[in-house]
Design a protein with these regions (language model features):
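Acidic, low-complexity/disordered tracts enriched in E/D and polar residues
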Residues: 1-46, 50, 96
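Long, charge-rich, low-complexity alpha-helical segments
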Residues: 24, 37-98
Length: 98
């Protein structure tokens, strides 16, 4: 997975307000317009998407994830970095301020 060297604990993230998505149960399906494909987000990815309805720092986001799911902090940070980097590349999640 790609990683964005610009992301640190103080990086402020938000979801792209123009992104089209819908809830199906507790998961999200969205249309990635840039790559012309549908994405089915699992419950962890859906949780991240829901948290980013308002801007959060990467550190706040990983704190929320560690509280919501039984995961070690180090694993959470790495997995979340991978996910965020991919979604930044797809312009689904945006960096507001580094």
């Amino acid at each position: 997975m790609k990683q964005n060297p610009l992301i640190n604990t103080n990086t402020i993230l938000q979801r792209n307000p123009d992104q089209l998505f819908t809830m199906i149960g507790d998961e999200i399906v969205m249309l990635d317009i840039k790559h012309e494909e549908y994405l089915n987000m699992n419950r962890h990815a859906s949780y991240i998407w829901q948290q980013l309805v308002t801007p959060l720092t990467f550190g706040e986001l990983t704190d929320h994830l560690c509280s919501a799911f039984d995961v070690e902090k180090k694993v959470c940070i790495q997995d979340t970095l991978d996910f965020i980097a991919e979604f930044i590349e797809r312009d689904i999640i945006q960096i507001i301020r580094e």
